[in-house]
């Protein structure tokens, strides 16, 4: 049997909102398997649906860039929020985002690329920046979207300056490349930033995630004591709601609260082919520090 630690119980409680004793029991029943423990709590009606993202604590910036029918986005991490306001760091993120337009999404290829205006690579420039600023930094990930005929749009939420912020979205829309489509692309970016969908269409939903969800929903429905035929209908309705939560094209358009995203896109005579959403530090664990400690750490180099 796995050793159930206090940290595991705390983590499960943060993920589900369930009570401490319930979380401990769930971990004991599932031999310490965190994912199975979440499902166990949900089946018992002791937890809300699993949260879609991990704890976010890392600092740095998300940067976007455009050129013609392509748009790119990168995430560059640092240790403290102070660095995000550093001009040299901002310039580095902007440059790497622009490089991704031609180099592509592969982070190793990006690091090996020549840094514009210098006689060394992006990786070497990053080493130099680390030495100057005094903090560890890393290029975590990159994404590029491209269209044949249409608009590659982007949206940055809470931008410190144009193209730099903590949440970034890329959107690929095929259609007539005009101002109206560009506006729609930005609106979809805002929608994605707010609703955090996991998939573009129902066909893109991870089959294993869907099966897990169905199993949980069926168990919840059976707890009602209703006949199996009624339970099947209940599960169908809840699966539809699941799709509306996680599938972009099935979601309700945040800008009017009524239409489906798919209808909005179709009405514009366009096709939404891809979206990418980066949240700074998504899924990265970082030891919590108070503001005074962060100031002291920054001052001490």
Curated annotation (Swiss-Prot):
The keyword Protein biosynthesis applies. It is found in: Cytoplasm. One of its GO terms (cellular component) is cytoplasm. Gene3D superfamilies: 1.10.286.20, DNA helicase RuvA subunit, C-terminal domain (1.10.8.10), Elongation factor Ts, dimerisation domain (3.30.479.20). GO terms for molecular function: translation elongation factor activity. Residues 80-83 are annotated as: Involved in Mg(2+) ion dislocation from EF-Tu. InterPro entries: EF-Ts_dimer_sf (IPR036402), Transl_elong_EFTs/EF1B (IPR001816), Transl_elong_EFTs/EF1B_dimer (IPR014039), Transl_elong_Ts_CS (IPR018101), UBA-like_sf (IPR009060). Keywords: Cytoplasm, Elongation factor, Protein biosynthesis. Associates with the EF-Tu.GDP complex and induces the exchange of GDP to GTP. It remains bound to the aminoacyl-tRNA.EF-Tu.GTP complex up to the GTP hydrolysis stage on the ribosome. Belongs to the EF-Ts family. This is Elongation factor Ts. It comes from Acidiphilium cryptum (strain JF-5). The lineage of its organism: Bacteria, Pseudomonadati, Pseudomonadota, Alphaproteobacteria, Acetobacterales. The gene is tsf.
């Amino acid at each position: 049997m796995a050793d159930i630690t206090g940290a595991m119980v705390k983590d499960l409680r943060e993920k589900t909102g369930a009570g401490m004793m319930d979380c401990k029991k769930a971990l004991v029943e599932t031999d310490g398997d965190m994912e199975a423990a979440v499902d166990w709590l949900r089946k018992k009606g002791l937890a809300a649906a699993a949260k879609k993202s991990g704890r976010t604590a890392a600092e740095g910036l998300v940067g976007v860039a455009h050129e013609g029918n392509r748009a790119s986005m990168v995430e560059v991490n640092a240790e403290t929020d102070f660095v995000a306001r550093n001009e040299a760091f901002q310039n580095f993120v902007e440059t790497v985002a622009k490089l991704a337009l031609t180099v592509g999404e592969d982070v190793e290829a990006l690091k090996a690329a020549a840094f514009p205006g210098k006689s060394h690579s992006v990786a070497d420039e990053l080493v130099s920046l680390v030495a100057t600023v005094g903090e560890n930094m890393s290029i975590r990930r990159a994404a590029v979207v491209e269209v044949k005929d249409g608009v590659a749009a982007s949206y940055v939420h809470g931008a410190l300056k144009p193209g730099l912020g903590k949440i970034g979205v890329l959107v690929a829309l095929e259609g007539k490349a005009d101002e109206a489509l560009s506006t729609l692309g930005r609106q979809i970016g805002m929608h994605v930033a707010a609703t955090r969908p996991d998939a573009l269409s129902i066909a893109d939903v991870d089959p294993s995630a869907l099966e897990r969800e169905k199993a949980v929903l069926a168990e919840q429905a059976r707890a009602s004591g209703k006949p199996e035929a009624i339970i099947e209908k209940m599960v169908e309705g809840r699966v539809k709601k699941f799709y509306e939560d996680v599938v972009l094209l099935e979601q309700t358009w945040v800008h009017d609260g009524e239409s489906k995203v798919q209808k909005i896109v179709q009405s514009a005579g366009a096709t939404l082919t891809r979206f990418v959403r980066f949240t700074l530090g998504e899924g990265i664990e970082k030891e919590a520090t108070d503001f005074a400690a962060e100031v002291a750490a920054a001052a001490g180099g």
